[in-house]
């Protein structure tokens, strides 16, 4: 557990943790608590978060398997530029959140790589951002009751997104009353699952 900054490059690790597995945490200062990961091969089993940063979490390259966690990736902001990431979580798979930060500091951005997320049953979200969601590239495969839950806006300009095997043409907020209609997409209509009970 590190307070301000953690940079991990070129390692091979297998981690079995009772709580958070890879963690950088600074509760006092939201401008630090940063984690940078590149060219690693990590296999993680966690009793709580697989990879946790109280600040910015940046993944540039490498292979990351979180085989068991409550939340797979958590950061104030999460930026994925590359790499191959596979997550199983019993709560949110990827969670961009920090109660002490401003909403404009909180976001999920995917520019490249592959992100596979499966979540357990219940009120769970494969990708949950307390701010904005931006996808410009890469491939996202989400398995769960929903896909995205965000409080800001969603921008989707490139890459491929699949939810439960179905290719998406826009990012739809699973939480009604969230951040407004992404891209002016309007209601989803009679998609799978139709009118929610």
Predicted segments with their positions:
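A composition-driven surface/loop motif
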Residues: 1-197
């Amino acid at each position: 557990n590190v307070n301000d900054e953690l940079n991990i490059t070129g390692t091979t690790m297998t981690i079995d943790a009772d709580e958070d597995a890879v963690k950088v945490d600074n509760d006092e200062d939201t401008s630090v608590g940063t984690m940078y990961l590149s060219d690693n091969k990590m296999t993680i089993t966690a009793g709580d978060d697989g990879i946790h940063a109280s600040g910015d979490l940046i993944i540039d390259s490498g292979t990351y398997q979180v085989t068991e966690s409550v939340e797979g990736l958590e950061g104030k902001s999460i930026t994925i530029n590359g790499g191959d990431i596979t997550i199983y979580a019993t709560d949110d798979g990827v969670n961009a959140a920090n109660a002490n930060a401003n909403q404009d500091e909180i976001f999920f951005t995917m520019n490249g790589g592959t992100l596979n997320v499966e979540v357990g049953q219940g009120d769970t979200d494969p990708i949950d951002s307390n701010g904005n969601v931006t996808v410009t590239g890469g491939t996202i495969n989400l398995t769960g009751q929903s896909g995205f839950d965000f409080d800001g806006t969603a921008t989707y300009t490139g890459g491929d997104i699949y939810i439960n095997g179905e290719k998406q043409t826009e990012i739809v907020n699973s939480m009604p009353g969230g951040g407004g209609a992404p891209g002016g997409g309007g209601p989803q209509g009679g998609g799978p699952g139709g009118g929610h009970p």
